[in-house]
Amino acid sequence: MTDLTLKALAAERQVSVDRLVQQFADAGIRKSADDSVSAQEKQTLLAHLNREAVSGPDKLTLQRKTRSTLNIPGTGGKSKSVQIEVRKKRTFVKRDPQEAERLAAEEQAQREAEEQARREAEEQAKREAQQKAEREAAEQAKREAAEKAKREAAEKDKVSNQQTDDMTKTAQAEKARRENEAAELKRKAEEEARRKLEEEARRVAEEARRMAEENKWTATPEPVEDTSDYHVTTSQHARQAEDENDREVEGGRGRGRNAKAARPAKKGKHAESKADREEARAAVRGGKGGKRKGSSLQQGFQKPAQAVNRDVVIGETITVGELANKMAVKGSQVIKAMMKLGAMATINQVIDQETAQLVAEEMGHKVILRRENELEEAVMSDRDTGAAAEPRAPVVTIMGHVDHGKTSLLDYIRSTKVASGEAGGITQHIGAYHVETDNGMITFLDTPGHAAFTSMRARGAQATDIVVLVVAADDGVMPQTIEAIQHAKAAGVPVVVAVNKIDKPEADPDRVKNELSQYGILPEEWGGESQFVHVSAKAGTGIDELLDAILLQAEVLELKAVRKGMASGAVIESFLDKGRGPVATVLVREGTLHKGDIVLCGFEYGRVRAMRNELGQEVLEAGPSIPVEILGLSGVPAAGDEVTVVRDEKKAREVALYRQGKFREVKLARQQKSKLENMFVNMTEGEVHEVNIVLKADVQGSVEAISDSLLKLSTDEVKVKIIGSGVGGITETDATLAAASNAILVGFNVRADASARKVIESESLDLRYYSVIYNLIDEVKAAMSGMLSPELKQQIIGLAEVRDVFKSPKFGAIAGCMVTEGTIKRHNPIRVLRDNVVIYEGELESLRRFKDDVNEVRNGMECGIGVKNYNDVRVGDMIEVFEIIEIQRTIA
């Protein structure tokens, strides 16, 4: 047989060459990959490998199977049996003796190190306690020495002042006694310090011993375990199903339930829990055997011995049920507490923060008020706004009747001042534009009707500075002209009158002045405050004078705005464009709006992706009083929404989502406003209240008669204010005006049209129809009477004469009285009269008759009266009992 090379032998044995070289080296034979291997060397290697296999670590593998049957109820009342087999496998490895010795040596070294550390910790604790005791003893000695020196100085002064030897002896005795006391105190302090030292050392030793025990148990070696579960254990639902099946089976057994032999207990944790459940069911059935051991499944809840005071977090609005859940009480208890406070509510009713705070504090809980708009306030406050205010251009809204040349006037101003020199005029009209004049810039709002004007004012945003009222010189004042006057007056905005069509032959400017003077618009030449400018939109006459009049009025108003910093403004109009998405026309009021800014606009937010001016040109920024069209919002905002530039887009999104969620609550809350029955709820002390009314009637005579009658109802406390009035049906403009002014809509022999009803329903306005003028006057008078503060009156209900005075340890002086008039009632306010002069006013605390507490004593009976916090009651005094009643005032 020829010798093989080592490489060929490795290929034959299917091992690597390096591995085979290492095995030869372990057997004591040095070989390389190209060396030949003889038969003798093969035998030597085989013997070496066999010895290694025999001397290897021993392994022991244990396998265990557990079989059980699970009954699962099926459809139709039948149960199905499922066989469950749980397999477990464990492998134990015998350690090498040398490895065991090494581990034992390491454990011994670790225990010695822990013991050394424990001894060092004990010694360190003893040293620290000793030093602490010495410091305390030294400080105590210093304090006692100082006290002793102070006492000696005091004693010395006292001895120097004393002249007799007897007093000197007394002082010396006192001094000796105090020294003894000081010594006793010092001894007690040393004992206390020694006791603390011993306790500290004992505690440290116990802690070190406990740590050593824990380390000992942690360091204990455990056999190497390889556990494999081949099946998932029974789930909780399966155990519940098994319990339900057992109950059904046991319920069907009428006899022999107790006589049945117990099944052998299963082993394992699942069997143990099943046994516990069986025991619990047996205890419930109340079988024989007397007192049973409590099952682990029985709940151990104990009712609290006293009320638990909680920290209740209350938002701006909360329902009664939510408040009860936060306080962990039943809703009926909260309703009872509210009834005690004088408020009726159902469990689903929304209450405000103040009411919820009163109820929670009344029930003994601590209230934490949380403002839900904290994030919104934080976002709004974290804005970089400039400090220096500069003059800004006025914002002008042009109003007037539809046929009076308002559109022509706007077109002429745009064609001459905005797009001069540009072929084709304006490329795009966005509802607002600004013009440059020699004296300054003016911004015009071109809004259809008065929608944006009133919606902004309803939201508290004063976007318009001046109103230009366009009146045709040949037509005079028309219904929409009157509506525009009412809107301007309600907003408190100055009016500049443009008398249009002055070039017509039938033009009569004086007639326009006379008609407008009836509505409070007086020209300056008549002593009024309104400027009248004669213009012609067709011929172009008077346009420059109109612009100068607007700038003059703006100069009087002294309009200023901050130009630098983050911008804020209002939405003039908005729409959804098919190619560009949500588009909003924004009028900047303060700061500068840049392209790329993050804006928060009502319920919407976004980054300004593009800005265009009224000419359709791309712009990068816009200052105060400049209208621009912005793209990039998440949705279409509403006209009149506030536009604010913020820093963080994520926070802007959170605020927008919060506003969307809050909108429903605000809408529900708005349903309670401007109701005649709830007018008195809005009453505030010290203010003159107003009942705002928008009146529409069938004829002008009815309007004047009703207006005069309502205005005559005004008093010093409640005023009737006619916000708007007119002839004809109730229109959408009337409803919008009522919503912006928080007014009541009154229709006399007229009705509201479809668009007005839609606004009335969405804004939850109070609309009332009348056909008899007396009913209208009476209901408004009742509403005004409800706004009057009630009158308080004191009514005497009883009088008692003091016949004798007794002393009571609980109430002090008790007056024995005879009731001479009326009835004496307990806990009522009283007055004590002596010689018909009031000497005390307080409250009746105790009322008894024949040692029994009573609530009232009638005329001709004797009783004992205890006056709260008053004991100077004398025989012959008169006790007067009265009650305070509220008299509701009415308007005559």
From Swiss-Prot:
Annotated region (G5), positions in chain: 536-538
Organism: Salmonella typhi
Domain tr-type G: 391-560
Pfam hit, one: GTP_EFTU
Protein name as catalogued: Translation initiation factor IF-2
Chain intervals with Basic residues compositional bias: 254-269
Taxonomic placement: Bacteria, Pseudomonadati, Pseudomonadota, Gammaproteobacteria, Enterobacterales
Family statement drawn from the similarity comment of this UniProt entry: Belongs to the TRAFAC class translation factor GTPase superfamily. Classic translation factor GTPase family. IF-2 subfamily.
Keywords: Cytoplasm, GTP-binding, Initiation factor, Nucleotide-binding, Protein biosynthesis
GO cellular component, one term: cytosol
Gene assigned in the entry: infB
Entries under HAMAP family matching the protein: IF_2_B
Compositionally biased intervals (Polar residues): 68-82
